[in-house]
Each structure stands twice: as structure tokens, then as C-alpha cells.
Amino acid sequence: MNKIHAVITGIGGYVPEYKLTNEEISTMVDTSDEWILKRIGIKERRILKPEEGKGITYLALKAIEDLKSRHDFDPLEIDAVLFATATPDYPFPNSASLIAHKVGITNAFGFDMEAACSGFIYALEVAQGFIVSGKHKKVMIIAGDVLSVFIDYSDRNTSPIFGDGCGCALVEATMEDIGLVDSIMRCDGSIPESLHVYGGGSVNPTTYETINNKLHYVWQDGKVVFRHAVSNMADTCQKLISKNNLSKDEIDWVVPHQANLRIIDAVTNHLKISRERVMINIEKYGNTGAASIPLCLCEWESKLHKGDKMIFTAFGAGFTWGATYLKWGYDSH
């Protein structure tokens, strides 16, 4: 019996033009290019400079332009728009609706979803559910963040890590034995204090006090985040590999969330996957949140082949994490 599969048929991405270098960071806090590169693996990150009317939807529209230049599509054929972001333009209206309007997607529904740095793989999970149900045939996923709005550039622990960016993907129905195969998704809200932005929500709405107390900036316990990120990403990847009877040699690519280089190396070392098969671009972009996996796919697209076996894995605030196993959907043009 034929089975409907969900397959990625196109990708796009965009990062702002402005490069915030380690040298510039070192003028703001007590650090150095050498220390940041050694400890985090980042040389520079892209920042969306504050300008009136420009937020994450601006980056998203640029990413969709890139997608359209790589893989032309008809906006009227899109059934749903899923936008994974922790930094929407506004509390409401949702950013997905604004993007759909500007792209000309008029026959679809859309919503924002928030899973922090795990947003892209969570969105893939939702898109797959829509498609294999038979109700929807083409879903646009957008995943991105303007994390610079959460950064206290006087904080040595967080200011070097994060950058801004956005990626997107078309996910379509196919009867071929290709596309998304299996996944494991998890969350754990038992220690939210380890990685958070506590200001601006319904518990701590914006006031002079929340601003003065810096509740609108990201705070993390780096050691706790490192430990949980490595153990949970490695564990879900290993379980997914075993569940699908894969050998390590069969995996063509691992695409990890670009949290920091030490986390990426620790996870792939656990999996015994060689560096040559791991997509890493954190040196150029930093941690771009939900955008990091699709930005890697954009950069490596020309090296991908139809049927390549791939593992995506991510970890983010919440905690949220997971891993996705898929067979790549097309040969690059």
C-alpha cells in the first residue's frame, strides 16, 4: 500500500549584513577573539541593527526570496505557514500571517510556534503531521530569530554567543519512499531557570522595574545547559539511529543546532560521526536560534543528493530537544 511521505523540496536563508566581530565584542566586555574562538567556536555573528519597521518578518521575507531564487514555487499552492520563532515582531498579530500576506499566500492558515532553538525540527514534526494526514499537500516552514534583542552586551557570558538569522523550507507530500522517516521530540520544564528571558510575558509584563532589573535579557547557566544539551541530543540521536537499524556509516550528514562548537563536538564524538559529515557554520553566524539548521542546509545544499540519509538534532530553552531522521528530497541544481 502506498504511503504519503513529507519531503523537503526547497530551502532558503538569510542573515543580516552587519558583522559583529569578536574584536568589537572585546571592546564591550572583558574577552578576546582568541578566548571566544577557543571556548565557543565563533568568529563573528550577524546582527539586525535596530531600525524602525524591521524585525524577524523582514529576515523571513528575505529568506523566502532566497528560497524562491533556488526553487520557484506558487504561493497560492501553500496550505499552511508555520513560523518557529522566539522573537516575533509583536505579541499579536502573529508573524506568520504578516509574512503570508506579503508573499501572496492567500489560500492557507498560519501560526507562530515557539520552541526556542529546537523550533525548526519541531516545525518539521508539525508539518509532517499535516501532510501525512492527507489534508495538506504543501507547507512552508520558517524558522528564525533576532536574538540580539535579548542580549546584554555588557554580559561576558552571553554577548559573544548569539546572532540573528532566518531560514525556511518547503515541505510537500510525495508517494516516493523519501523525506521525513522518523523522529524523537522531547521537552522538560523542570529547570527553566537555567536558560530564560523572564521579562515581557504575562508573568512579568514590561515595566520600569523589569527593564531596570534586566529581565528582558537572556540568562543562562552555561554548565547546566552544556550538560543537558550534550546528553539529550546525543541520546535522542542514538535512539533514533538504533530504532531505524542504521549503522553510523550509513549516515551521510548530521546537522546539529549551532549552539556552540564544544556542544557540537561533544555530541558528534558520542555518536562517533566524523567531522567531514557534520555541518558546522557557527564560526560565521554564532547561535542563530531556530535558524541554525536551515542556514546550514542552505550552505551545504550543493553537496546534497537525493536520498542522502540525514540526522537533524537540536536543543533549546524549555528545555526542548529532539532528533529527526530523513532522506534528502532532491539533487541540487
UniProtKB/Swiss-Prot annotation:
One of its GO terms (biological process) is secondary metabolite biosynthetic process. GO terms for cellular component: cytoplasm. GO terms for molecular function: 3-oxoacyl-[acyl-carrier-protein] synthase activity; beta-ketoacyl-acyl-carrier-protein synthase III activity. Pathway: Lipid metabolism; fatty acid biosynthesis. It is found in: Cytoplasm. Keywords: Acyltransferase, Cytoplasm, Fatty acid biosynthesis, Fatty acid metabolism, Lipid biosynthesis, Lipid metabolism, Multifunctional enzyme, Transferase. Residues 258-262 are annotated as: ACP-binding. Catalyzes the condensation reaction of fatty acid synthesis by the addition to an acyl acceptor of two carbons from malonyl-ACP. Catalyzes the first condensation reaction which initiates fatty acid synthesis and may therefore play a role in governing the total rate of fatty acid production. Possesses both acetoacetyl-ACP synthase and acetyl transacylase activities. Its substrate specificity determines the biosynthesis of branched-chain and/or straight-chain of fatty acids. This is Beta-ketoacyl-[acyl-carrier-protein] synthase III. It comes from Azobacteroides pseudotrichonymphae genomovar. CFP2. The gene is fabH.
